[in-house]
Amino acid sequence: AKVQPLVKWAAYLPPEQGTPKAGELPTLYVAVVQDTSIPGDLATDTGIALANMTLAAWAKGVGSCIMGAINKPALTRLLGIEEPQKLAFMVAFGYPAHKSSIVPLTEQTGVKYYLDENRDYCVPKRSRDEIARYL
C-alpha cells in the first residue's frame, strides 16, 4: 500500500485506463538496486536481472511490469536504500487482469502502447530482425 502511490502505471494511458483498480493490484513489488561501488556495466547487469526475474515469473503464470516511472527519492527513503546503492527500477508481480500483445512498431504507432477494443494492451516493439544480427 505504501508503494502504490509512488509508482506510475502505463504512463502513455490516462490514469483511469492504465492504473490497476482494487482487486487488480500486484501481489509483490521488487526493488531493483544497483551497487555503484562495483565496477562494470550496471545497465547490462540490471537488464539481465530484470529479464531473468520477469521470464521466470511468466513461466509460472505470473505477470510483471518493469516500472521506471517511479518516485525514486521517496522509494529510496521508504526502502532505506543508502549509498553506494541506488534504486534503478521497481518490478510489480501479480496475476494479469488484461492480456498484452506485441504489435509491430511503425511510424504510425510510434512507441506508445494502447488499449484495443477488448481493453487489452497492445505494445509496439521493433522486430527481432531490426534489433539483432545473426552469424
Where are these regions (language model features)?
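Acidic, surface-exposed loops and disordered segments
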Residues: 1-135
